[in-house]
């Protein structure tokens, strides 16, 4: 009788533990300030990030002003998402806003998603493909004719120069 009880307990324990260890096989839910974004796992074949890149791209941090490698870049080319390589901005839309970060007055169509911050004071911009934090967008400042400034962390992007 004691052996039967022990055997039944062991089976229940092993079954329960193996059920807890099963992985989610289809989708992962990313949460960001009250919103949920469901991303199929097949799209999660992203580039590895350094701890500092992860602090900005995943945890929505900000690099220190004036420290980004693309702030003063004037070469012709395309700025891509550091995490998934999606094209985000063309160099023709980049301008010097003297704000300490690269500034663009337009994105590649459909490449950037705008998400109002929880307090409504700013609008976050993220990669439309993978949800990577890029920075913030500001309207009505008068820097360019488009009256839009995408203030982007250099650390969130790579630069691919045009072929000469």
Label the predicted regions:
Residues 21-41:
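Sec-dependent signal peptide cleavage junction
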Residues 37-80, 86-164:
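A short Gly-Trp-Pro
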């Amino acid at each position: 009788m004691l052996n039967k009880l022990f055997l039944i307990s062991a089976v229940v324990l092993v079954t329960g533990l193996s059920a807890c260890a099963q992985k989610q096989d289809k989708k992962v839910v990313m949460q960001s300030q009250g919103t949920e974004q469901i991303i199929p796992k097949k799209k999660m074949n992203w580039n590895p990030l350094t701890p500092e890149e992860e602090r900005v791209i995943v945890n929505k941090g900000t690099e220190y002003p004036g420290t980004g490698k693309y702030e003063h870049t004037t070469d012709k080319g395309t700025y891509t998402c550091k995490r998934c390589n999606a094209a985000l901005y063309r160099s023709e839309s980049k301008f010097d806003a003297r704000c300490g970060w690269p500034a663009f007055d337009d994105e590649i169509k459909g490449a950037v998603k705008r998400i109002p911050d929880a307090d409504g004071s700013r609008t976050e911009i993220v990669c439309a493909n993978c949800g990577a934090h890029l920075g913030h967008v500001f309207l009505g400042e008068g820097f360019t004719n488009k009256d839009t400034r995408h203030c982007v962390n250099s650390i969130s992007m790579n630069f691919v120069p045009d072929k000469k």
